[in-house]
Amino acid sequence: MGAIISRWKTKPSTVELLESLDKDIKDLEEFRAKNQRLLKLWVGRLLFYSSALYLLTCLCVYYLYFPQQWGARLITALPLLAFPALVLLLRKMLIFLFSKRTERNNDKLEDLKTQKRKILEEVMETETYKNAKLILERFDPESKKKAEAEATPVRPHMTPRPGQELRQRHIAMATPGPVLGPMSPGTTPLRTAPGGPPEKGLAGSASTPAGASQAETPQQMMRRSMNPYSPGPGSGMRPPGPPLARPILPRERGAVDRVIEYLVGDGPQNRYALICQQCFSHNGMALKEEFEFVAFRCAYCYFMNPARKTRPQAPRLPEFSFERRLRSESPETQSSAATETPEDSDAPEDDMERTTSADPQNPAADEAPVLQESETEESQPQDVPHAEAEALEEQKKEDESN
């Protein structure tokens, strides 16, 4: 009879089993959270009420029942000293009881989770793809996300080195240029970027022989379209043209670099980005002082970005050269020396001979003619032009009178 009744009972499906397991797991998780809240509540109440009772008892004993003898005082103070130890013991007992309940709850929770994991593995092996997908979406969304993340390939993040370009662009022709003459089948067209030098074809016609076919077959095009992660024909090439106007600072900086930047007053927060006005590309960063006066050529579209302001120039100072002054004074001295007669030049020598013969033992007498000679030599170049001017004026007066 029991066998017949057992046959009539239907076996629960996997969905029903998973639903019951989910319900039990949620109940256990709620019980664990509730248990932790109760532990905090009971411990807090114990400490609060025990401390309040302890203070009231101490006050009552001190003012009402505190005896005068020291022996009686010690006996009365013993319960007051033992009460804090009793409260700490009760606190440890509460923590121990609640921790035991939490451990039992965690054991049951782990058992239910292992049962659920086994059922899900059986579902993935036995059920169809559609049913398995629905069950996983409903009862195990985390494993589904992990499976999708493992299925989709992740491209490695390439960090550029200091000497490499951060990004590489291949700018297509935005407007059709002028129509050129018919080209030979062996040559490749040139692409010109706005504002910069022409860019060679990506296929590299110089490296391929003249008879080789440069057009891709339809099968190669289909393979490239099916694989989105395959590199393009010119992805490994460096775009021609000038480098960046200013170096781009590294994004990952250490503590020492930040301290140095703070002391020096340099860093990304103290710089402005150089953005191209045509293609809006990042061309490095410039200091605040030179940002308004920097003119740069874009490294991607080769457009010349003019400076926002012109740097003010200070007025030019007059040049002073000591050599020019000496050169300007030298013709006057030469002309004055040429006008001197040989008699005048020999006169100081005769005076020196006379003074030395007259007083040979007096050094002061020897120095005096020398000083007089130097004074006469300095005064002669100034007196000679004045005498010439007077002679010319007298000659003019005589001519007018005649």
From Swiss-Prot:
GO molecular function ontology, one term from the record: identical protein binding
Keyword Cell membrane: no
Family membership: Belongs to the lunapark family.
Name recorded for this polypeptide: Endoplasmic reticulum junction formation protein lunapark-B
UniProt keyword list: Coiled coil, Endoplasmic reticulum, Membrane, Metal-binding, Transmembrane, Transmembrane helix, Zinc, Zinc-finger
Main location per the UniProt record: endoplasmic reticulum
Compositionally biased tracts (Acidic residues): 341-352
Single biological process term from Gene Ontology: positive regulation of endoplasmic reticulum tubular network organization
Lipid bilayer topology: Multi-pass membrane protein
Lumenal-facing ranges: 67-77
